[in-house]
C-alpha cells in the first residue's frame, strides 16, 4: 500500500468516526461533545487532584441510579466510560462504568465549597479544532456509507 493510499484510508476512517460522533450528538442531549467539551477538564487517565478545585459532577440515569463522577476515561459514539465513586466500597473505591448516552437523563454540576470552581472551560488547555469541511462531510455522510 502506498503512502498516499494509507493517508486516504486514514482520512476516510477519520471521516467515518466524525460522522458516528455527530449522529450520537444529534440523538442524545448528553452525547460525546457534551463530555469532551463541557466536561473536558474531567477527561483524563486519573482522578483530579483536589487542589484543582473542579466541580462535583453527578450523572443521573434513566433507571434512577446516580453516578458520582471522578473522571472521564473515554468516549465512543455509543457510550461514555466513567470512573465513578463506588458506594459499596464505603471509602475511596472507584468503579469503571460504560454508560450508553441514551440512558443519561440529567447531569448535575455543583461547585465545591470554598473557592470558586471552574465549570467546563479552560484557558490553559486549547480545544481540538476540527475543520469545517470535515464536520460538514460528517454531517451529510449517509448512514450506509458510514457503516463500511
Kindly label every feature range from the protein language model:
Residues 1-62, 113-148:
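Short glycine-rich, low-complexity segments
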Residues 71-72, 85, 109-112:
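Surface loops and adjacent helix of pleckstrin homology
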Residues 68-71, 96-101:
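Short amphipathic beta-strand/extended segments with alternating polar/hydrophobic composition
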Residues 98-110:
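Phosphoinositide-dependent membrane-docking surfaces
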Residues 56-78, 83:
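Amphipathic, interaction-prone secondary-structure segments
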Residues 43-46, 50-51, 73-91:
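Short, compositionally biased strand/turn segments
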Residues 53-60, 86-97:
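Short aromatic-glycine motifs in intrinsically disordered, low-complexity regions
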Residues 67, 77, 89-91, 106-107, ...:
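Eukaryotic short linear interaction motifs
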Amino acid at each position: 500500500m502506498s503512502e498516499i493510499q494509507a493517508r486516504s484510508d486514514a482520512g476516510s476512517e477519520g471521516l467515518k468516526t466524525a460522522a458516528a460522533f455527530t449522529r450520537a450528538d444529534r440523538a442524545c442531549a448528553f452525547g460525546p461533545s457534551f463530555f469532551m467539551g463541557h466536561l473536558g477538564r474531567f477527561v483524563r487517565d486519573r482522578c483530579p487532584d483536589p487542589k484543582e478545585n473542579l466541580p462535583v459532577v453527578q450523572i443521573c440515569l434513566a433507571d434512577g441510579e446516580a453516578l458520582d463522577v471522578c473522571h472521564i476515561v473515554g468516549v465512543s459514539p455509543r457510550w461514555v466510560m466513567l470512573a465513578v465513586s463506588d458506594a459499596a466500597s464505603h471509602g475511596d473505591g472507584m468503579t469503571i462504568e460504560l454508560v450508553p448516552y441514551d440512558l443519561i437523563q440529567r447531569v448535575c454540576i455543583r461547585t465545591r465549597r470554598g473557592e470558586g470552581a471552574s465549570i467546563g472551560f479552560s484557558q490553559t488547555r486549547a480545544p481540538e479544532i476540527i475543520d469545517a469541511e470535515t464536520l460538514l462531510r460528517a454531517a451529510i455522510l449517509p448512514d450506509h456509507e458510514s457503516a463500511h
